[in-house]
Amino acid sequence: MAEIRNFTLNFGPQHPAAHGVLRLVLEMDGEIIQRADPHVGLLHRATEKLAESKPFNQSIGYMDRLDYVSMMCNEHGYVKAIETLLGIEPPLRAQYIRTMFDEITRILNHLMWLGAHGLDIGAMTVFLYCFREREDLMDCYEAVSGARMHATYYRPGGVYRDLPETMPGYQPSKWHNEKEVAIINRNREGSLLDFIEDFTARFPTCVDEYETLLTDNRIWKQRTVGIGVVTPERALQLGFTGPMLRGSGVEWDLRKKQPYAAYDQIDFDIPVGVNGDCYDRYLVRIEEMRQSNQIIKQCVDWLRKNPGPVIVNNYKVAAPPREKMKNDMEVLIHHFKLFTEGYCVPEGEAYAAVEAPKGEFGVYLISDGANKPYRLKVRAPGFAHLAAMDEMVQGHMLADVVAIIGTMDIVFGEIDR
């Protein structure tokens, strides 16, 4: 009798559902997966090593490029670690601005996840809907930093600058005439806070539209219910964090359990799943978008009523205002020193973690008293999730691999670093 052997299949790295450069070596019995071996490292850029050769401030831009769809949350973890070593506390207004932009980033990330996850499984419409809202939020990034993605807006001691009083508007072009541009610009006539407030009023209706397309859709449920089930105990053992852990029914969120920035002064709920499958993780992320919208609303209200400084008044750490540089030689020297050799951080080590959209993004920083980190270690949430791939796909069909990769919300920038 002929020997029956398992079939080995390479999934990725050139695959639209591989979310970057994932290579999976799948051992299959017919259509059923027996084993999955993820191969990582194809997007390794030596970020941790690069940070050791640059002054502390110059590595903020590298953080944006780790998980490149949750940019400001990565920056937050890094500057938080530096602030711990320096022993400085950002002004309260800066804390609220950070909280607001962390939540804008969370919505940006979840919209990208939902659109891509839907497209992977075959729901094309939701992809177009999600990118419609992402445009507005990227304009918020652009308003404060000039960049739509890699903002480099957070600084040790606060944020780069206060929220602008005007919003950039669209100009007439060969694609949009003056009448169309006037319609697009109608909510851009006020300040950035006005624009964000207008967005928060519209966004719940947009989430309802996504749910109309997917939540009760029987094809969506057939593809996600009971797929990639992880028990609460196993999720904790595997080091899951964020929506992957909460989807399994564990109520753990750093914003509540270890509050940072202004989260201890804001009212919001933690959505938690029941079954630990792809469908529950989808519902958790959908509800997180609604909660983030509520947090942004509260931040906008507070920021309107409380003007003030947005960065510490210490020119050894924070850049001085340009007006002072024109009149005061000492301030000019501070500016020159800050942007050439930076500042020396006291000897010691610190771990700072933030609740990034994908889970706990942690930065472990060791300083030897120089102006560069001695060692920078990034704790990427996606790495722990990808490590569970073999366990999650065993016994499932080949088509379910795509649903499981999608539900993990994997970005290889942070996994390969």
UniProtKB/Swiss-Prot annotation:
Membrane topology, from the record: Peripheral membrane protein
CC terms in the record's Gene Ontology section: plasma membrane
Alphabetical UniProt keywords: Cell inner membrane, Cell membrane, Membrane, NAD, Quinone, Translocase, Transport, Ubiquinone
Keyword rRNA processing: no
EC number(s) reported in the record: 7.1.1.-
Gene3D superfamilies reported for this sequence: Cytochrome-c3 Hydrogenase, chain B
Catalytic activity: a quinone + NADH + 5 H(+)(in) = a quinol + NAD(+) + 4 H(+)(out)
Subcellular location: Cell inner membrane
GO molecular function: NAD binding; NADH:ubiquinone reductase (non-electrogenic) activity; quinone binding
Enzyme superclass (EC): translocase
Role noted for this protein: NDH-1 shuttles electrons from NADH, via FMN and iron-sulfur (Fe-S) centers, to quinones in the respiratory chain. The immediate electron acceptor for the enzyme in this species is believed to be ubiquinone. Couples the redox reaction to proton translocation (for every two electrons transferred, four hydrogen ions are translocated across the cytoplasmic membrane), and thus conserves the redox energy in a proton gradient.
Family in the record: Belongs to the complex I 49 kDa subunit family.
Subunit text: NDH-1 is composed of 14 different subunits. Subunits NuoB, C, D, E, F, and G constitute the peripheral sector of the complex.
Protein name per the record: NADH-quinone oxidoreductase subunit D
Source species of the chain: Nitrosococcus oceani (strain ATCC 19707 / BCRC 17464 / JCM 30415 / NCIMB 11848 / C-107)
